Regions:
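C-terminal core of ALDH-fold dehydrogenases
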Residues: 28, 329-414
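NAD(P)-dependent aldehyde/semialdehyde dehydrogenase
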Residues: 265-367
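Flexible, glycine/charged-enriched surface loops at secondary-structure junctions
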Residues: 23-27, 168-175, 252-258, 285-291, ...
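Rossmann-like NAD(P) dinucleotide-binding subdomain of oxidoreductase/dehydrogenase enzymes
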Residues: 87, 95-234, 238
Length: 415
């Protein structure tokens, strides 16, 4: 039996044990995991230092290095995320009554775990803790296949979580990291449809496409974040500037950072000079259409096909539009169904934008950086789904469960 088959079968067996574990017991384990992460920071940081050293030697991008790096504050944030998950309602076991049929049978639906989730991600060691805890609370076993860049960090975090599982006499296979980053093993993992119920890839376009093209298991894509801010003709100048700077410069290497700016032509002469100075002060590189270039000391004029890039750095694409519909057309063509924002004082424009834009999260007068499970009240998220089945947007506990029908009768038979 191969390593991958062994891991998948062990996870399936472990998931059956977890499915019957009560909420109080799960919360006890999770609280212990949170404490253990804080207590074992030294070993986790040492493993992360090895990953960072190798990543720098391999000239990993600044955005990837930012995602890879752990600090005491980030480890505490992982632990805090688990504490939040403890405080959330357990969806498993929730029952929804559908009524009694004319023949007397009673129909209801019961929320149950998916079973075994496979998480495939790149240089994001925090995903190991977030996904492990979310899957555990929602009753699922999880197989974690992180990128080679974060392997030592992911193994160190998983080791801490598995120590807690052993302490509570639970199988380690509930949270497993694939110990070898060989892509051939990932391909084998994607064939395990008898033992894995769902694959969730988080990473760059190449990884997402590889998983989607090669998986025999259902996939929920967590695709790139080409997020736009549209500054409407009625926008408040200061609000729009704050949304732009927070969305673009607070943290550039994340999927909910702004990559595109659309400005109504009527407000451009007033607002773009202010935005240009603020972006210059932050060192943001400007790419734009010809109509906007005059507002910037240095700018690269883009051809039509060059819009829609995910920069993940201090760089942005800017375009003027003559109406709300043109802004929505641009987003439909170049957006990635992640997060889109309008800044406007016109309620009708906000409603049209939020109803008409096809994205997992559509915001009015709020920063794109709020497109995050913890900020939206879900606790630590397993990712932001950009496909519509079976979840769309930040995925919390409920998205890691499904429903089955329960039918109760008194001996009725079908005529």
């Amino acid at each position: 039996m191969s390593l991958i088959t062994e891991l998948a079968q062990a996870a399936r067996k472990a998931s059956r044990k977890l499915a019957t574990l009560g909420t109080d017991s799960k919360n006890q384990v999770l609280s212990a995991m949170s404490d253990a992460l804080r207590a074992n920071q030294e070993s986790i940081l040492a493993a992360n230092a090895r990953d960072l050293q190798a990543a720098r030697a391999n000239s990993l991008s600044e955005a990837m290095l930012d995602r890879l790096a752990l600090t005491p504050a980030r480890i505490n944030a992982m632990a805090d995320g688990i504490d939040t998950i403890v405080s959330l309602a357990d969806p498993v076991g929730q029952r929804r009554e559908l009524g009694t049929r004319p023949n007397g049978i009673k129909v209801s639906k019961l929320r149950v775990p998916l079973g075994v989730v496979c998480m495939i991600y790149e240089a994001r060691p925090n995903v190991t803790a977030d996904a492990g805890a979310l899957c555990f609370k929602s009753g699922n076993a999880v197989i974690l296949r992180g990128g080679k860049e974060a392997l030592d960090s992911s193994m160190a975090i998983a080791d801490v979580l598995q120590q807690v599982l052993r302490l509570f006499n639970l199988p380690e296979a509930l949270i497993t990291v694939v110990p070898d980053p060989d892509r051939a093993l990932m391909l084998e993992l994607l064939q395990q449809r008898d033992d894995i119920d769902l694959v969730i890839p988080r990473g760059g376009e190449g990884l997402i496409n590889f998983v989607t093209d090669n998986s025999k298991i259902p996939v929920i894509q967590h695709f790139k974040g080409v997020c736009h801010l549209y500054v409407d003709r009625s926008a408040d100048v200061e609000k729009a500037l704050n949304l732009l700077l927070n969305g673009k410069t607070q943290r550039t290497g994340v999927c909910n950072a702004l990559e595109g700016l659309l400005v109504h032509k009527d407000i451009a002469p007033v607002w773009l000079p202010i935005a240009a100075q603020a972006l210059a002060d932050k060192g943001v590189k400007i790419n734009c259409d010809a109509a906007s270039a005059a507002y910037f000391e240095q700018a690269t004029v883009l051809a039509e096909h060059q819009f829609g890039e995910e920069y993940l750095r201090l760089e942005i694409a800017i375009r003027q539009v003559d109406c709300l519909d043109r802004a929505m057309d641009h987003i439909a063509r170049f957006g990635s169904h992640h997060t889109e924002v309008i800044c406007t004082e016109d309620l009708q424009a906000a409603v049209r934008f939020q109803q008409g834009v096809d994205a997992a999260v559509v915001m009015a007068n709020a920063s794109s950086r709020f497109s995050d499970g913890s900020e939206l009240g879900l606790g630590a998220e397993i990712g932001i789904a950009t496909t519509k089945l079976h979840a769309y947007g930040p995925m919390g506990l409920d998205a890691l469960t499904t429903e089955k029908y329960l039918v109760n009768g008194a001996g009725q038979v079908r005529a």
